[in-house]
């Protein structure tokens, strides 16, 4: 049987990294097995669902390059793929399961269930115990005469229910640990516990890979599957695999209130798809015990849901950034340069359309910072000074505080030496040789003392791309203007 997996989020809020990790594992398993990845939307909660959130989920998957074979936006043989558009399908199946006796009417309210338990000397919170399974027609008519409408419950088997979880192994829910459950509200609206397995059955889903938080609903859904098999709707129960929680700081479950839970928070900071996909994959799976950095293709080739670790995975921001930096360094330099542009524009370093001169500067500068950043969001601070004029370079407070007592002497000697370098020879090798001779050999300055003030003068920062290469990019006139400006400011 060909593998068919699905990702079926509710469009509420911004995409959460745990949600996207679930999509990623489903996508990877489909690609590894040559199966199909379905993308379905569970939008039956009108009060919470939004088109904005729907658009963000689409944006997230496309940004991470997680393509789908069937589903919203692309169509397929089981359309529609939004639950809000499948009401007639659910009504037909509800009628079928009611006629077969798998679903029955239940009029008891929550208060009446509690009163029933108290009358039997039990904990009132024990829940429903199937006491309305066999209401007579007269009892139903009496309830309706009072203006009451029934919920519909699924009749569950009175036996142990076991399944082999792909991540956690054999799991058994003993008979009586779960009771007949509501599948349709009194207002005739079907619940998630009904529509989710029904859609999986109708769409031929073979493997349900989802979060650990849904483990407790699995026996109910398997019971529904048995009813669907007995009524000829499907022929099999899918395999289930429950993925581990994603934890945040302090070993607490990552909450939507935590900034790092928001996928777009990471994109805005400058994660690239390759880096973030790599790190999200590590939240429960690994390629090997001694290798954390790998390509998407390598992950797909090796991914097996049976290798997922059932223990909670902690989102480690520093490790995520480090892995992202490794992937930045794997990019072709031209690709890296192009990816920095949105961040440079957002920071006001560049204004679109980018000029040919600016592109030339970026092409020269990109290799200098590609080895030094972990996030694309760091590039405006590293490159901004190369696109500014001397008068607009602001000296940062920590950079000014780092200047040694003899900074003025170093600047003056540098200006004098660099003025003698011919324009035709203005390249980083000649610049470095000239400054080392003037400051290190002649004045006896240590390199850190000699070159630190020059870095501050050029960039306004203590940390910048390589000094001599930066001077070469800026050109002789602009370099001297910046050195003179700081020298004058120091008096």
Curated annotation (Swiss-Prot):
Extent of motif 'HIGH' region: 9-19
Catalytic activity annotation: tRNA(Glu) + L-glutamate + ATP = L-glutamyl-tRNA(Glu) + AMP + diphosphate
Single annotated GO MF: tRNA binding
Entry keyword set: Aminoacyl-tRNA synthetase, ATP-binding, Cytoplasm, Ligase, Nucleotide-binding, Protein biosynthesis
Localisation per UniProt entry: Cytoplasm
EC number of this enzyme: 6.1.1.17
UniProt xrefs under Pfam families: Anticodon_2 (PF19269), tRNA-synt_1c (PF00749)
Residues annotated for ATP binding in this entry: 256
GO CC field: cytosol
Main location: cytoplasm
Function, in words: Catalyzes the attachment of glutamate to tRNA(Glu) in a two-step reaction: glutamate is first activated by ATP to form Glu-AMP and then transferred to the acceptor end of tRNA(Glu).
Assembly, per entry: Monomer.
Cited PANTHER family: GLUTAMATE--TRNA LIGASE, GLUTAMATE--TRNA LIGASE, MITOCHONDRIAL-RELATED
Family named by the database record: Belongs to the class-I aminoacyl-tRNA synthetase family. Glutamate--tRNA ligase type 1 subfamily.
Name of this chain's protein: Glutamate--tRNA ligase
Taxonomy of the source species: Bacteria, Bacillati, Actinomycetota, Actinomycetes, Micrococcales
